[in-house]
């Protein structure tokens, strides 16, 4: 069974939010008060969106922080889905 298709939330941040608004990584990091490497790593898919980052992005873009955390959780769950999980059988009480 192939891995489910997973899009890193950083890619969504870049293509759906930053690019349409002509926001640079530098500008976004400055506006939300985080170090530039944090946003750079998120956009490059090398870092997860933390609760702190989700809160800041939520305020800046006018969305609930939960939106960003849901993107991250969905991505993490899709990556965690593997063939070995299919071997686990639900427990049945005797």
Please report, for each region that a protein language model flagged, where it lies by residue.
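A short, Lys/Arg-rich alpha-helix, primarily the initiator
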Residues: 1-23
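The alpha-helix within a helix-turn-helix
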Residues: 18, 29, 58
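Short alpha-helical DNA-recognition segment
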Residues: 23-41
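Short, basic-rich loop-to-helix N-cap that marks the start of a DNA-contacting helix
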Residues: 46-59
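A contiguous, mid-protein "functional segment" used to position or interact
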Residues: 56-76
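Short, charged recognition helix plus adjacent turn
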Residues: 69-94
